[in-house]
């Protein structure tokens, strides 16, 4: 297992993170998974034995049950120096202040997460989604308070747009407050929109990148083929995240993953994960599952290195279109492109 610095921090995290959205099985999250305590204990040990040192969860996952189970598994102790990341923003109750990124909600939810996780500190506390009604100054100040109180060590964001991130970083700099060290984003061979703004920002601003749903909800695992959706998948259960806008492109990507996997003697899922782990700007990919074999298979991706030729084959079926203003930069600015620019435009120069 390789360990990488998380953004502009001294914290090193494994290139694979254990995700926990399948743990708990409460409410709408039952569509994703129903992993109980005994299974979760086994999966945590499996990940830690493989060298994983970061577990990612959220208060909203199964209405707190995911955090509670992880807290029970860890037993108030940190096995093998494991780091805990969690998130807050979504509504946890019916009241008007039970959601969002206000000082009121963030501080109360952080304290609730600490209790559920049976710990006195959260290593990475992430705002789970944008809140356009709470001033960023208030959100950043609340996070800064939590760090200064010793309840949180590092802060990050999730599902922010490019301008959201840059505004937040500007607020932190202007007010001399804690700064996001990472962003958690959706990024796969099928969904490469992050390459327009989010990956360049990560490179330019030294932000860590944690990738959620790196297999597109299992669509890139190789189990889904043209005209075939296996039983028991989250798509059949009504979980429509992530959206697929071009099915033909998806199947071309899956076909290429299957072909490369067969040539290498590995699984398509391992190829898809290895592609991400090897992408510039990516710090760690978050894996999850309902079965032990899913974890075992995904963990093996940590040691798989794709060749340049294999990467070119995957690019050929998945490169995102060069939209404005990038096509104009490609035409008129390619003599002075920087490292962050080339993360998107490099294949076209």
Give, region by region, the residue ranges found by the protein language model.
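Glycine-rich beta-alpha junction loops
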Residues: 88-90, 161, 187-191, 213-220, ...
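Aromatic-lined glycan-binding groove of carbohydrate-active enzymes
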Residues: 194-232, 267
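Conserved, mostly hydrophobic/aromatic
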Residues: 6, 18, 55, 70, ...
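Terminal-tail/helix-coil boundary detector
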Residues: 204, 228-263, 278-282, 296-349
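Generic structural signal for well-ordered alpha-helices
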Residues: 44, 67, 71, 110-114, ...
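N-terminal binding-site loop/beta-alpha segment at the start of enzyme catalytic domains
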Residues: 1-82
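Short, well-ordered coil/turn segments that N-cap beta-strands
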Residues: 11-16, 51-53, 78-82, 119-123, ...
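Glycine/proline-rich, positively charged
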Residues: 27, 32, 93-197
């Amino acid at each position: 297992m390789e360990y990488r610095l998380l953004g502009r921090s001294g914290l090193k995290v494994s290139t694979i993170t254990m995700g926990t959205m399948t743990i708990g099985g409460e409410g709408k999250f039952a569509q994703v998974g129903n992993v109980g305590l005994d299974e979760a204990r086994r999966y945590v040990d499996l990940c830690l034995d493989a060298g994983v040192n970061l577990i990612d969860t959220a208060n909203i996952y199964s209405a707190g049950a995911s955090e509670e189970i992880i807290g029970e598994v860890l037993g108030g102790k940190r096995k093998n120096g494991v780091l805990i990341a969690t998130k807050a923003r979504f509504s946890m109750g019916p009241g008007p202040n039970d959601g969002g990124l206000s000082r009121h909600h963030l501080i109360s939810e952080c304290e609730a997460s600490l209790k559920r996780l049976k710990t006195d500190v959260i290593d990475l506390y992430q705002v789970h989604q944008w809140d356009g009604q709470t001033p960023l100054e208030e959100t950043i100040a609340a996070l800064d308070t939590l760090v200064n109180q010793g309840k949180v060590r590092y802060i990050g964001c999730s599902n922010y747009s490019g301008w959201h991130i840059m505004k937040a970083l500007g607020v932190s700099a202007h007010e001399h407050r804690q700064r996001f060290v990472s962003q958690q984003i959706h990024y796969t061979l099928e969904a490469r929109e992050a390459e327009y703004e989010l990956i360049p920002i990560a490179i330019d601003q030294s932000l860590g990148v944690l990738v959620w749903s790196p297999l597109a909800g299992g669509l890139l695992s190789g189990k889904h083929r043209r005209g075939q959706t296996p039983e028991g998948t989250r798509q059949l259960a009504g979980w429509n995240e992530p959206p697929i806008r071009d099915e033909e492109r998806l199947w071309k990507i899956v076909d290429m993953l299957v072909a490369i996997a067969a040539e290498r003697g590995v699984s398509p899922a391992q190829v898809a994960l290895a592609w991400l782990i090897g992408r510039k700007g990516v710090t760690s990919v978050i894996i999850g599952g309902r079965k032990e074999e899913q974890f075992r298979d995904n963990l093996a991706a940590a040691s798989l290195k794709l060749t340049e030729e294999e990467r070119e084959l995957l690019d050929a079926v998945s490169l995102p279109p060069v939209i404005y203003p990038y096509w104009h930069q490609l035409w008129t600015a390619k003599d002075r492109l920087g490292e962050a620019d080339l993360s998107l435009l490099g294949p076209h120069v």
